[in-house]
Structures are given as structure tokens and as C-alpha cells.
Amino acid sequence: MANVVVVGAQWGDEGKGKIVDWLSIEADIVVRFQGGHNAGHTLVIGNQVYKLALLPSGIVRLGKLSVIGNGVVVDPQHLVEEIAKLAAQGIEITPDNLKIAENVPLILGLHRELDAHRESSTVEGVKIGTTKRGIGPAYEDKVGRRAIRLMDLAEPDTLDEKIVRLLAHHEPLRRGLGLEPISAGAIRAELESLAPKILPFMDATWDLLENARRAGKRILFEGAQGALLDIDHGTYPFVTSSNTVAANAATGSGLGPKAIGYVLGIAKAYTTRVGGGPFPTELLDETGQLIGDRGHEYGVNTGRRRRCGWFDAVLVRQTVKTCGIDGIALTKLDILDGFKEIKVCVGYDLDGRRIDRLPASQSAQARVKPIYETIDGWEGTTAGARSWADLPAQAIKYVRRIEELIEAPVALLSTSPERADTILVHDPFRD
């Protein structure tokens, strides 16, 4: 059996939570390997709705081990709050079903403050459209080798020197930005108050996962955001601060590349994006408004309305290649029910020349214009379909055309937020 990596094939918000929950029934372990609590997702199980941001989706399933890998940045305050919120919904979270890598960097109050300050800036190019949760600044400190990591809370005698090293960078930065000074004592007090609540979950997760892999356990790697937000392969600088492509499932969990088996990309049947940055197929008319209203396109964490547009086969084909995607889970097909015509982007016009990929240049990305292929819509409904026989013939044609354009098969088809409303074409764990 293959281990499975789930990644977003667009700009995030593709419906990964439902698909991961659906796959977690077969998994023994579910691992988050990058990002932080900036990637909210909603799970609908029976009559219960769970809203997660940091914890792996497997946490709501009995008998599953959830792991937060070293590639994640953890806000300890948010972690405690999310655990408490789930506990109020009847989900018990203990060190038996949740493990956190000992070397995860921590998000502190100063990171959140810095992030929010940057996003409120009126200087051109400074505002990216982040969730203001401190993710980027925390990754900056990780790369700058000054981060406070979870294991540091277990060694209070060495904590002061690490805080001093952290502030050696942040104090002059804060002065330059006009922010109030922050004391080492305040940071230490913040960490000491949270340490007893989160240290019990600490483990050498790389070792735990490797032993599980060798024992034949099925591991599901849960990506956050989407491949087009990857710090290297995304629409830079309008990206997140981590690698969101599938290869980072290994690095971000402490395993070797052979641990990755089947790569499942998640894509909506249309396209959405939150925040700034290029969006070639964006619809600024009533059609875009209609798609957003039907799809309830609002961020789980922020409540921000998502930008909406037609399916961009060029971008998804690009992420199929950068992520090594074996199959696609196509979600929200039902949102397109009733459209007389549906457009799919099959190429770009850049200064009068046709191209078949998104250029890396920021200025070129802003100039590309979509080249559309128009496909007949369907009158019947796809909502709640659980087999191909339940789908209108034209809806099937739409799916098949997408497969051709992105050069990857559709392995799963989601037709509503309910986990049972899923058409399985190929089981990723059986690869």
C-alpha cells in the first residue's frame, strides 16, 4: 500500500479537509507537514461541523494518530484554544492521539504583531494579503536560526539566552517600524504559561513516523494552502512562507523521499483565490459573484470573500508537474450546475504570443490574458452524486475534458461537503 500525500493544486481552499477526512478512514496516521494555523478547513461529519486550522484532520477520527511535523510553525496559544474548542465538541485530544515534532518553531506574540503591522502598511508591495497570524515572521526566524522551538520549553535554563538572540533581531526592527519595545521577561512569561499545556505532546516524530512506515502503517500527509502559494513555485511574492508542493511532505515530516507514495492533488471545478496576486481567469462580473455565492466562498479563518473565476487548466497542469501529482480529486462540481456554458482556460496570451505555462516573472504574470475553450453546461444536478450514473452526461464530458487538459486522471469526485457524496474512481491507498 502507498502512503498518500494530499496537496492543493490551486491557491488553497480546494476542499482538502473533506478529502483528507474521507481518506483518513483508511489511514493509521495523518501528518501536517507545513504551514500553520493560517489554513482553515471545515469538516462535516454527520450533524457535526468541525473547523480546524492547525490540527490534522485525522484528529476527529477515533483510533487515528495525528502528527504535526517539523515543517509546521505552531502558535502555542492557538493550539491550546483549538484543542479546547474540539474538546467542547466531544473530541478528546491527548498525547496518545496527537504528537508534535520537538523541533517545530513557535509563533509568538511579536510575530503576530509584526505580521499585522506589515499588512496594514500602505507602502506598495508590502501588503501581501496574509491572515496576520504571524506565519511569515515565524518562518523568517526559523531560516534566520533564531526561532524558539518547542524543545526549548523543556529546557528553561537555556531559554533566556535564546530569547536574547531572538530580540537582537526584533528590537531594532520594531524600533524602525515604530512598534513598542517588548521585554525578554514578557516573552518568557508567555512561554512559561503555555509550556505545561503543550509539552506533553512533544515527540521525536521523525523516528515515530519512520518506525510506523517500516511496520507497514498507512500514512496520510496533509498539505495546507495550495501549490500555487509555494514559496518557490507559486506566484511570488504573493505566496505563503513555506514549500507547499508534495516533495515537502518528506522534508516537513522528517522522512526520506521514498516515504512518499501516491500524490493526490485537490482542485475545484472552478478557481478561487484569497488576497492579492495574479489570477488570470478571475471573474469580476455577476458570474463570478454567482459562483462565490453558490460555493460559499469565504475564508474559514478570516471570513474574507474569495476571488472566483473559471477553471484554469494551465495552472493545474503546472502543479501536476511541480508536485508529481498522480491523480486529482475534483471538488465542488455541483456549483457549476445550471450554467448554460462553462469556460476553461487552455492557454495564455502574453503580449500577442500564446504560452502554455504561467511565467515566473511578476510583471509577465500580470499581463497574461486567458485563452478560453467553451464547454456546454448541464441542466441536471450533480449535487449529492455518488456514482458516475448519477451525473448528467455533459458533466462527465466536462470532467473528462479537464483530465485531458491537465494531463492527470480524476481519482475522486466530490459533489457536496458531505463525506459520503464522493465518487471514487481510484483509491490512492491501493496504488
From Swiss-Prot:
Lineage: Bacteria, Pseudomonadati, Pseudomonadota, Alphaproteobacteria, Hyphomicrobiales
SUPFAM superfamilies: P-loop containing nucleoside triphosphate hydrolases
Cofactor: Mg(2+)
Pathway membership: Purine metabolism; AMP biosynthesis via de novo pathway; AMP from IMP: step 1/2
Function (record text): Plays an important role in the de novo pathway of purine nucleotide biosynthesis. Catalyzes the first committed step in the biosynthesis of AMP from IMP.
Coiled coil, from the record: none
Pfam families (UniProt xref): Adenylsucc_synt
UniProt-annotated catalytic positions: D13, H41
Source organism (scientific name): Beijerinckia indica subsp. indica (strain ATCC 9039 / DSM 1715 / NCIMB 8712)
Residue sites binding Mg(2+) per the record: D13, G40
Record localization: Cytoplasm
Cofactor note text: Binds 1 Mg(2+) ion per subunit.
Gene Ontology biological process terms, A to Z: 'de novo' AMP biosynthetic process; IMP metabolic process
Name of the molecule in the record: Adenylosuccinate synthetase
Subunit text: Homodimer.
Binding residues for IMP: D13, E14, G15, K16, N38, A39, G40, H41, T131, R145, Q225, T240, R304
Catalytic activity: IMP + L-aspartate + GTP = N(6)-(1,2-dicarboxyethyl)-AMP + GDP + phosphate + 2 H(+)
Magnesium recorded as keyword: yes
CDD domains per record: AdSS
Protein family (similarity comment): Belongs to the adenylosuccinate synthetase family.
Binding site residues for GTP: 12-18, 40-42, 306, 332-334, 414-416
